[in-house]
Amino acid sequence: MPHLTDDDIYYWRQGTHTHSYERMGAHPNQRGTWFGVWAPNADRVEVTGDFNDWRFGADVLDRREGGLWEGYVRGAQPGDKYKYHLRAGGEWFDRTDPYAFRMEPPAQNTYEGLSALITDLDTYTWGDDAWMTTREGPSGIDGPLSIYEVHLGSWRHEEHGASLSYREVAEPLADHVQNLGFTHVEFLPLAEHPYYGSWGYQILGYYAPTFRYGDPEGLMHLIDTLHQRGIGVIMDWVPGHFATDPQGLTYFDGSHLFEYEDPLMREHPDWGTRVFDFGKNGVRNFLLSNALFWMDKYHVDGLRVDAVASMLYRDYSREGDWSPNVHGGRENLGAISLLQDTNEHVYDEYPEAIMLAEESTAWPGVTTPTEHGGLGFLYKWNMGWMHDTLEYASKEPVHRKHHHGDLTWTLSWAFSENYTLPLSHDEVVHGKNSLWSKMPGDDWQKAANLRLLYAHMFGHPGKKLLFMGGEFGQHREWDHDRALEWDLADEPLHEGLMEWLGDLNHLYQNAPALWNDQEDGFEWIAYDDRENSVLTYRRLNGDRSLVFVLNFTPVVREDYRIGATGDGRWHERLNSDSDVYGGSNVGNRGAVHSDPVEKHGHSHSLSLTLPPLGALVLEPAE
């Protein structure tokens, strides 16, 4: 009896087979394994492996409609290595299974190229039932979302310098994230990638966790551990382009199957990778299924979609050397449709999922629902906020008054999409320096500036994201071959920075005023004090509010007045200059009472002492 049903073939040919991984690839049972592969240009497909001593001609697959091939091999069992042996145009070549659930480490290759391993993904016993039934709460758009971005291979190393495995990293990572109060971890791509220096963004095996850190059950254990600690997991996903390694997807069946046939569109000029042909139904099946695969089999809570702008524009980085769409335009209609369909199918099956877009242009409607013509993402990275805020924060305080608009004008578009504010890996590599090194001044001022930067990130509308190392102020920029500088975390200024970040996260998770990222959740009190480089704004959610007062100079400002809503006492919820965080302990002794002095359009005001390079978070007493 065939493994592929008539329905499978129908949905495959329509480009709507959203769980094609259940039919394609290798699927073992008690007596053997079913194999399925898409290779329409091939006139013969065989599977070779440990089970037939890698003999050509031993196990030939049957051709089905839609360019599909399938076959059953008795005796092929989990753990056996295998490859496809294809003939097209009179030539034979070998390919790794595009749907492989696991790939072997290259050092163990017994056959030219990278082999897949037959793998049963249903043997792991999950312990995250409580998380899976309640996760819609912490991931809702009206709730807190604070993400710790991690490159797993360089987060922490063993004593002899090796990266920690999925299992080894699970407990220490969960401890660290839980102690700091982040709601989610976002992993840079963990799908199989031959080139470690790509950070995972040049993928060969879209369905296989990279062998570098262990086996599939190891990754399941890591995610399970995080879930049991109440921490969500987001995976970086790269549906726009893929690695060119000859054993992978490139020229898979002797034709440009997964990539564009058009030479002007085929290669990505920035990364030297191949670009998926988003209009092909087989490619759409492959990518749509892959998005759901990570949620189905690995309990991933969401995907951060990489380089969306490079998918949306046919002329992206091509400087005039590109092919227009059927209407003569630059929009990539296939990519737009794929992204919309992916988001629709994800939210149909996982309404609580988090879909984030790294989209660096002003493309309209990234987070608008697809039924209203948008791409359908839940969040978009606010790249403009990241650029302008870091540009401002890196300037000497004496010059900041001349660049005051860099901070204020980000609010002019803050509500045009559902944004996430990313202080990401991209900002601490390639000569850009670490966040610590970007800050001006001596070590005390660098620490104070970073505390101030983080306060503004948590006060500004938008969800939060911080790349690893930023929590304690790593000195050197990130290097994927080296572990973080964990010894710094024990030094007073760096320890204080972590304490501050933890308290910001705690405040964020417990202050509904910070969850409302719509226009009615933000109110300027004073945005125009450029002479003193001070910003004052209020965050609101119903009758709950918090006031942020940010002093971007090292000058203590006495009797600094801000407008207040009525008569009453205000608590100093947080003060970044507290000695607990390594500051100079300048502040307002924990509280201040409003006076009947008009200011900023209010009948009452607060007389404050602003700490140097300091942030105050004030809350009205109940």
Swiss-Prot record:
InterPro entries: A-amylase/branching_C, Branching_enzy, GlgB, GlgB_N_E_set_prok, Glyco_hydro_13_cat_dom, Glyco_hydro_13_N, Glyco_hydro_b, Glycoside_hydrolase_SF. HAMAP family: GlgB. Transmembrane segments: none annotated. Belongs to the glycosyl hydrolase 13 family. GlgB subfamily. The active site is at D306 (nucleophile), E358 (proton donor). It catalyses: Transfers a segment of a (1->4)-alpha-D-glucan chain to a primary hydroxy group in a similar glucan chain. It is an enzyme of class 2 (transferase). It comes from Salinibacter ruber (strain DSM 13855 / M31). Its EC number is 2.4.1.18. This is 1,4-alpha-glucan branching enzyme GlgB. Pfam families: Alpha-amylase, Alpha-amylase_C, CBM_48. Pathway: Glycan biosynthesis; glycogen biosynthesis. Residues 581-606 are annotated as: Disordered. Catalyzes the formation of the alpha-1,6-glucosidic linkages in glycogen by scission of a 1,4-alpha-linked oligosaccharide from growing alpha-1,4-glucan chains and the subsequent attachment of the oligosaccharide to the alpha-1,6 position. Keywords: Carbohydrate metabolism, Glycogen biosynthesis, Glycogen metabolism, Glycosyltransferase, Transferase. GO terms for molecular function: 1,4-alpha-glucan branching enzyme activity; cation binding; hydrolase activity, hydrolyzing O-glycosyl compounds. GO terms for biological process: glycogen biosynthetic process. Monomer. GO terms for cellular component: cytosol.
